[in-house]
A protein has these predicted regions:
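Acidic (Asp/Glu-rich) sequence patches and key acidic residues
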Residues: 1-133
Length: 133
């Protein structure tokens, strides 16, 4: 399989996540990112660049109280679309409301099959666990 054909991950979720629910999910996403990073870095020498980087493919993974965002390493040619989850979405909100009346947000991330796809999939499974469908 060619890695340039795209690995597009797309999902919808609530446009706003309740603070208590976000705190639990945020903590689990950090644990999952640490585990994914450990797996991605296993067997690599200490002088190589980290696989997971900030949303632009540079710097540190962005872990803030209301946002988690990351990408692959741009220096290694392993960056694709940034992956970002926010407690309160500011973009991508669709007008149609879900059954419970809340607004939804549409998200996508094309990792192009780069190594950080592992972290993207792991975080998406964490979202599914906490938020359901």
């Amino acid at each position: 399989m060619r890695t340039d054909e795209g690995f597009v991950r797309a999902w919808t979720m609530a446009a706003e996540i309740a603070p208590e629910r976000w705190r639990a999910m945020h903590a689990d996403m950090i644990l999952v990112l640490r585990a994914a990073s450990w797996e991605l870095e296993r067997g690599r020498s200490d002088d190589t660049l980290a696989v997971l980087r900030g949303p632009e493919g540079l710097g540190q993974v962005r872990i803030q109280p209301e946002v988690i965002a990351f990408n692959g390493n741009a220096f290694l040619g392993e960056a694709g679309d940034p992956f970002s989850i926010e407690r309160v979405a500011e973009r991508g909100i669709i007008a149609r409301r879900s059954r419970d009346g809340s607004r939804r947000v549409v998200r996508r991330c094309d990792t192009r099959g780069q190594p950080y796809d592992l972290a993207v999939c792991a975080v998406l499974l964490t979202l599914l666990h906490h938020l359901g469908d």
